[in-house]
Amino acid sequence: MISKPDKNKLRLKRHRRIRGKISGTAERPRLSIFRSNKNIYAQLIDDVAGVTLASASTLDENVSDATKLEQAAAVGKAIAEAAKAKNISTVVFDRSGYLYHGRIQALADAARENGLDF
């Protein structure tokens, strides 16, 4: 029998490796992303204090009739606006082991267009 690698286990392995190298502070928090089949979530995290500074997700937004890519872009815009409200302009991007493609890229591009630097 041919064994297929478990994609989520490989993603979690990449995520642990990435998290060993990056960390967020109050001045430059970590923009962490989680993607499920149905929704996408983004958080600004201060790892020094262990606090979530702001968050946004497709559950917050009224984007039920939009495509998943459009939903991700709306979340990117919302997290950038939440960061502006807290006077945060630069972040450390944590893609959580996901490939920088599709919904992850759409969220990142929308956040950049709305004023976040990373």
Swiss-Prot record:
Annotated organism of origin: Lactobacillus acidophilus (strain ATCC 700396 / NCK56 / N2 / NCFM)
InterPro entries listed in its UniProt record: Ribosomal_uL18_bac-type, Ribosomal_uL18_bac/euk
GO function terms (MF aspect): 5S rRNA binding; structural constituent of ribosome
BP term (GO), one: translation
Subunit architecture: Part of the 50S ribosomal subunit; part of the 5S rRNA/L5/L18/L25 subcomplex. Contacts the 5S and 23S rRNAs.
GO cellular component, one term: cytosolic large ribosomal subunit
Name this polypeptide is given: Large ribosomal subunit protein uL18
Family: Belongs to the universal ribosomal protein uL18 family.
TM ranges: none
Function comment: This is one of the proteins that bind and probably mediate the attachment of the 5S RNA into the large ribosomal subunit, where it forms part of the central protuberance.
NCBIfam families registered for this protein in UniProt: L18_bact
Keywords: Ribonucleoprotein, Ribosomal protein, RNA-binding, rRNA-binding
